[in-house]
Design a protein with these regions (language model features):
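Start-of-helix register in tetratricopeptide repeats
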Residues: 5, 39, 78-81, 123
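"A position-specific structural signal for the A-helix of alpha-solenoid helical repeats
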Residues: 2-5, 9, 43-47, 85-88, ...
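Alpha-helical repeat scaffolds
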Residues: 22-30, 56-71, 98-117
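Short coil/turn linking the two alpha-helices of tandem helical-hairpin repeats
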Residues: 45, 50-56, 90-101, 134-136
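Short helix-adjacent coil turns
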Residues: 17-22, 74, 102, 136
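Short coil turns that delineate tetratricopeptide repeat
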Residues: 35, 74-77, 119
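Alpha-helical segment of the N-proximal tetratricopeptide repeat
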Residues: 4-29, 33, 49
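Heptad-repeat amphipathic alpha-helical coiled-coil interaction surface used
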Residues: 24, 44, 51, 70, ...
Length: 136
C-alpha cells in the first residue's frame, strides 16, 4: 500500500503541470476505490474531465469519482469540492445529452445535507445556481 499523503502531494504537482493522463494512471494503479481519500477522488475526476474534451464517458467516470469523494467524508473541504464538481459535471452531462427531464433530487439532497458547510463555498453555490436555473 502506498502512502496516500505522499501520493496526493506528488499528484498535485503533476496536476499543476497538466499531466492528467499520468495522474489517472497513478491513482488507478496505486490505489483501490475504497482506499481513496476525497482529495484523490476529486483529483481523479478533475483529471478525467481535463484530459478529454468533456465527452459522455469521461464525464460519467468523473461523476462517479466526485460522488465517491463526497460520500467518503461529507463535510470536509475536499468533500465539498467533490460535491461542487459533482453538481457542475452533472449539469454538463445533462446539457451534453440534452436530458431535460433529469431528476435533480439526488443533487438537491446532497446539497441540503451539507448546506450549512457550503454557505461561503462559492463554487458549490454557483453550481447550485446552474441546477436551479434548469429547474425553472
Amino acid at each position: 500500500m502506498v502512502s496516500l499523503q505522499k501520493l496526493e502531494i506528488e499528484l498535485q504537482e503533476l496536476f499543476k503541470q497538466k499531466q492528467y493522463s499520468k495522474i489517472i494512471f497513478e491513482i488507478t494503479s496505486q490505489t483501490e476505490d475504497e482506499e481513496r481519500s476525497s482529495s484523490l477522488c476529486n483529483l481523479l475526476g478533475l483529471s478525467r474531465i481535463s484530459n478529454d474534451n468533456k465527452n459522455k464517458d469521461s464525464l460519467s467516470m468523473a461523476l462517479r469519482d466526485f460522488k465517491q469523494g463526497y460520500l467518503k467524508e461529507k463535510n470536509t473541504n475536499h468533500a465539498i469540492d467533490c460535491l461542487a464538481n459533482f453538481i457542475t459535471s452533472s449539469v454538463l452531462l445533462i446539457d451534453l445529452e440534452k436530458n431535460y427531464k433529469f431528476d435533480f433530487s439526488e443533487i438537491i439532497n446532497f446539497y441540503a445535507l451539507t448546506e450549512k458547510f457550503c454557505i461561503n463555498h462559492r463554487s458549490i453555490n454557483l453550481a447550485m445556481a446552474m441546477v436551479y436555473r434548469r429547474l425553472n
